[in-house]
From Swiss-Prot:
An example molecular function term from Gene Ontology annotations: cyclin-dependent protein serine/threonine kinase regulator activity
One Pfam family from the record: Cyclin_C
Name of the protein in its database record: Cyclin-B1-1
Keywords, ordered alphabetically: Cell cycle, Cell division, Cyclin
Length: 449
């Protein structure tokens, strides 16, 4: 075996390329001629199939058969080193020449494209919204050019329709700050006056008198008007606070809504109701004997006190209610802000209509805020104020002119018939010079037509 290996190793073999198929076939033929060729298979040299990248024109030298693996590995190492050196020599010039090629490519300047034509498209609102969304997403990519937004034909036609209908020409509501002059007045509670009147608006819907005349057997609306006329006269003679008058009428109507009263006790109800209101509102309230004298001793002390207790129990001692008086004061302030002055005549005229409203049974079930707004509206109409109903008044009252017309007509009618009426206490009271003689003004009969 050693002699055979030496002979094979000593025999010179021509150099063979990697892809030389003829030499490989010859080698296979020699191996096939051996006696044990059928029992075992010859192993090829690793160096013959090694994939080594060499420069062009230099063939790979194949290791002679029979050499050890160390010689093939050494040959492979040398070939890889030569390939790496040749590769560095070949890449360096290309890397140097590449910037020149890039600069040469940037030299030609392309002409600027012509500006795109603006086309107005007619599309639906949904298409327009989708287009706007797509444009919004693409705006981050196209930051370099921002074009002016072009209105579509649909938006143009919509705007023209609004102009034709007068929608865009409608001015915005101008709400005056009616409390700006009371900033230094601690009693005006400017910081939460709006919250107070919001509470009044909610509270006025509770514990309201209802339409009770049909439930009363011996009392009608005319008798109630007579009682109201007498209460107003007593209030004026005693020179009581205005809050006392409105609270007295509330107690009367509220009690009559819950309890049937005989005809002979109707005035007793009025006397006891005024006594309750005086104790609630006045600093120096009249005594029971004063009411006995003013009623011409029609009732005794015990009767007045017993009726007082009965009324309070029926009302469950609930006397803290907003009346028309608190709303009138607020609405007059809003009207004075609109007129840019404090009008005393306007104040007297508004309270004149408010006291006429106390005698009208048709306004018993109305909200105090609506009665107050109707009184202010009728007063402005009688005094020919312009504008008649401002945005500030609408904001603070919560009512429009159309909502106040029916109540205002009733008040203006009462004003026109007051001089010939038998119940003339209110008319005489406001005909005096002390209250400006506002009752003598010509009524606004044009509202009743």
């Amino acid at each position: 075996m050693a002699t055979r290996s030496q002979n094979v190793a000593a025999a010179p073999q021509p150099p063979q390329n990697r892809g030389n198929v003829a030499a490989l076939g010859k080698q296979k033929a020699v191996v096939a001629g051996r006696p044990d060729a059928k029992n075992r298979r010859a192993l090829g040299e690793i160096g013959n199939v090694m994939n080594v990248r060499l420069p062009e024109g230099k063939p790979l030298q194949q290791a002679p058969a029979g050499r050890t693996a160390n010689f093939g590995a050494q040959l492979l190492k040398n070939a890889q080193a030569n390939a790496a050196a040749n590769k560095q020599n070949a890449v360096a010039p290309a890397a140097v020449a590449r910037p020149a090629q890039r600069q040469a490519r940037k030299a030609p300047v392309k002409p600027a494209p012509p500006p795109p034509e603006h086309v107005i498209e007619i599309s639906s609102d949904s298409d327009q919204s989708m287009r706007q969304q797509s444009e919004g997403s693409a705006s981050s990519v196209r930051k370099c050019s921002r074009k002016k937004v072009i209105n579509t034909l649909t938006s143009v036609l919509t705007a023209r329709s609004k102009v034709a209908c007068g929608i865009t020409d409608k001015p915005r509501e101008v709400i005056e700050d009616i409390d700006k002059l009371d900033g230094d007045n601690e009693l005006a509670v400017v910081d939460y006056i709006e919250d107070i009147y919001k509470f009044y608006k909610v509270a006025e819907n509770e514990c309201r008198p209802c339409d009770y005349i049909d439930t009363q057997v011996e009392i009608n609306s005319k008798m109630r008007a007579i009682l109201a006329d007498w209460i107003i006269e007593v209030h004026h003679k005693f020179e009581l606070m205005p809050e006392t008058l409105y609270l007295s009428m509330y107690v009367i109507d509220r009690y009559l809504s819950m309890q049937q009263v005989q005809r002979r006790e109707l005035q007793l109800v009025g006397v006891s109701a005024m006594l309750i209101a005086c104790k609630y509102e006045e600093i120096w309230a009249p005594e029971v004997n004063d009411f006995i004298l003013i009623s011409d001793s029609a009732y005794t002390r015990e009767q007045i006190l017993a009726m007082e207790k009965g009324i309070l129990n029926k009302l469950q001692w609930n006397l803290t209610v907003p009346t028309a008086y608190v709303f009138i004061m607020r609405y007059l302030k809003a009207g004075a802000s609109a007129d840019n002055k404090s009008d005393k005549e306007m104040e007297h005229m508004a309270f004149f209509f408010a006291e006429l409203a106390l005698m009208q049974y048709g306004l018993v079930a109305s909200l105090p805020s609506k009665v107050a707004a109707s009184a202010v509206y009728a007063a402005r109409l009688t005094l020919k104020k312009s504008p008649l109903w401002t945005d500030t008044l609408k904001h603070h009252t919560g009512f429009t002119e159309s909502q106040l017309l029916d109540s205002a007509k009733l008040l203006v009618t009462s004003h026109s018939t007051a001089p010939e009426s038998k119940l003339r206490v209110v008319y005489k009271k406001y005909s005096s010079e002390q209250l400006g003689g506002v009752a003598l003004r010509s009524p606004a009969v044009e509202l009743c037509k």
